[in-house]
Amino acid sequence: MAQHIGFYMDNIICVHWGTKYPVKFVNILYSMCKRNMTRPFNFYCLTDEPNNAFAERVKPIRIPDPQFDGWWNKMHLYDKRLEIEGNILYMDLDVVVINELDEFFTQYRDEDFLCIRDFGQPTTTINSSVLRYNLKHHSFIYDDYMNNKSLYDGMHGDQNVITDMMLRHEKTQILPDDWTYSFKWPERGQPQKYEKYLPKKHPLKKKAKICVFHGHPNPDYAMQYESGEWVKNYWK
């Protein structure tokens, strides 16, 4: 579990389970965050294998209930047993951090649940690749999920559950669209097939904070092509 400290630092967290992503994805995410945070922060990894070869400053937290499958492990992000104090920025492992992340912590209230609009259709749903929350205010998400697990497990995944619970919640704030964008679908609401898109030149959106690589391709694959050549300068 997380260590208690005398004041609330900013926190960044990711989730790593199974073999879908090598451990280097965790370490690269930490490295990108380190370059793009001017404020002190803790970096946590919620994982089924806390003894993995994580970078020195990565603080592993064992997933409390390892019987969860796949993306349902992400519901543990809201589990008060993590004992993380202060605001928490969650990012999927397949993102590329482009610019400073401080505003996730400085521009909103602690009680605000911050999320981004989805990239495909409809854009009115929540994309769970990037979220900011606080266990003091949002651990009810985990409690509600556990109390209605059979109902929620019938949904497609955690993203649908978060949309159902939080889209109309009074403290939910949708982050500015220009903070995040999709590598595959750079304009929200205009999805393309990646195999048609990948060979094209893909200009970097230099004012964005995070580029999301949902589905295929991942950053390490995309940067082999002209359309993702810029990724080499950031995903490291």
List the predicted regions and their residue ranges.
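A glycosyltransferase accessory/donor-loop signature
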Residues: 5-28, 39, 45, 54-62, ...
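Surface-exposed amphipathic alpha-helices with a cationic face
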Residues: 30-35
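Short, solvent-exposed loop/edge-beta patches enriched in aromatic
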Residues: 37-41, 84
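GT-A fold catalytic core of metal-dependent nucleotide-sugar glycosyltransferases
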Residues: 51-55, 60-62, 66-67, 72-125, ...
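Short glycine/proline-enriched turns and hinge-like loops at secondary-structure junctions
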Residues: 124-126, 223-224
